[in-house]
């Protein structure tokens, strides 16, 4: 597309058409209408994260050091959530908490809400970008549909879960070690690993990795030898029009291995799309359930028997005790303002409940 220069005719001077022509023209980096949402939001989200991990402390919200300036490294630095006392405040820079003071805003955890909200809209903008480009080149929108999986997980974990709890404080902070701590929190307080939605998510992600490895290896194994090169990258012509591997050979191979095999490429690739995306959707649905404090599987009969019989123990009862230990330690550590003091009789001991 090009922009017409000179005097516009009656049909050409519409501002929308001018903007559409400029936004969607063919260039090295496509902008598009989705770019109006994607690029500013991604810029602010990444900029806020780099600023927070470099300079901003979490002393006032978590009692922690969380920046490179304080001695953290890439794995331990984080943009931390606001304090529990700030509940679900958007923590706008000009709001009643910070009152326009940038330093105070950073100390209160304003960068977390800034990064979380801009990050969510950046991800949505990226999905819209895939929709827009697919429509422009007349493709179906399955890329965008697939990307809805990561968006669902991000929104459920960083936004919906803390909205269901008492504040942003209970969302993950943006950092590697901080995410690990959040995972331990999920296990201790929600028994997340025994949640069926988590199980479906694990099956989806690991199943997708297996499918990806099998698919890649099978295609490599059945490449036509179109050249005399010994390796994959020299054994075919990158400009050839015809197919480079044999679906028939692959089908025969896996039919002999498993007794069943994919009979056509559409079903094969749809399955590779379906498995991970469904797993991510199920995980997101499970986190929404946790926001409402829905419980995972409870095997109460085993708990009662373990409490009555010191010689009876299962991996389940051991994990329940581990969860109690996590809760007893994390609650007092993470929420000192609650003055949580646990008497000895409520702390885990042996295999009794």
Curated annotation (Swiss-Prot):
Residue numbers of Phosphothreonine PTMs: 2
Membrane topology: Multi-pass membrane protein
Record-listed chlorophyll a PD2 binding positions: 198
List of residues binding chlorophyll a ChlzD2: 118
A GO BP annotation: photosynthetic electron transport in photosystem II
Transmembrane feature ranges: 41-61, 125-141, 153-166, 208-228, 279-295
Cofactor note: The D1/D2 heterodimer binds P680, chlorophylls that are the primary electron donor of PSII, and subsequent electron acceptors. It shares a non-heme iron and each subunit binds pheophytin, quinone, additional chlorophylls, carotenoids and lipids. There is also a Cl(-1) ion associated with D1 and D2, which is required for oxygen evolution. The PSII complex binds additional chlorophylls, carotenoids and specific lipids.
Keyword Ribosomal protein attributed: no
Catalysed transformations (reactions): 2 a plastoquinone + 4 hnu + 2 H2O = 2 a plastoquinol + O2
GO cellular component, one term: chloroplast thylakoid membrane
Enzyme class, spelled out: oxidoreductase
Similarity annotation: Belongs to the reaction center PufL/M/PsbA/D family.
Additional note from the record: 2 of the reaction center chlorophylls (ChlD1 and ChlD2) are entirely coordinated by water.
Protein name listed in UniProt: Photosystem II D2 protein
Primary gene name: psbD
């Amino acid at each position: 597309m090009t922009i017409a220069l000179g005097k516009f005719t009656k049909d050409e001077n519409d501002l929308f058409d001018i903007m559409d022509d400029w936004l969607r023209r063919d260039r090295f980096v496509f902008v598009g209408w989705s770019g109006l949402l994607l690029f500013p939001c991604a810029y602010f989200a990444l900029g806020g994260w780099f600023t927070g991990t470099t300079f901003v402390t979490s002393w006032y919200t978590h009692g922690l050091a969380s920046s490179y300036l304080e001695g953290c490294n890439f794995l331990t630095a984080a943009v931390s959530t606001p304090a529990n006392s700030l509940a679900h405040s958007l923590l706008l820079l000009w709001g009643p908490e910070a009152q326009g003071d940038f330093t105070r805003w950073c100390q209160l955890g304003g960068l977390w809400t800034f990064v979380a909200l801009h990050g969510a809209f950046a991800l949505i903008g990226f999905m819209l970008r895939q929709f827009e480009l697919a429509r422009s080149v007349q493709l179906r929108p399955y890329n965008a549909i697939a990307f809805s999986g990561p968006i669902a997980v991000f929104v459920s974990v960083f936004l919906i879960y803390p909205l269901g709890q008492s504040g942003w404080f209970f969302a993950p902070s943006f950092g590697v070690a901080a995410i690990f701590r959040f995972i331990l929190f999920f296990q201790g307080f929600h028994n997340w690993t025994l949640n069926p939605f988590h199980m479906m998510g694990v099956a989806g992600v690991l199943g997708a990795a297996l499918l990806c490895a099998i698919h890649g290896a099978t295609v490599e194994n059945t490449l036509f030898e179109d050249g005399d090169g010994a390796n994959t990258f020299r054994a075919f012509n990158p400009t050839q029009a015809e197919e480079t591997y044999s679906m028939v050979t692959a089908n025969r191979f896996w039919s002999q291995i498993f007794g069943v095999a994919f009979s056509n490429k559409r079903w094969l690739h749809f399955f590779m799309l379906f498995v991970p995306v469904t797993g991510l959707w199920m995980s997101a649905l499970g986190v929404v359930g946790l926001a409402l404090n829905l419980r995972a599987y409870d095997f109460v009969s085993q708990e009662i028997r373990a409490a009555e019989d010191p010689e009876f123990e299962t991996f389940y009862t051991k994990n329940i005790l581990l969860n109690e230990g996590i809760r007893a330690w994390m609650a007092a550590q993470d929420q000192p303002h609650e003055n949580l003091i646990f008497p000895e009789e409520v702390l885990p001991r042996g295999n009794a409940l």
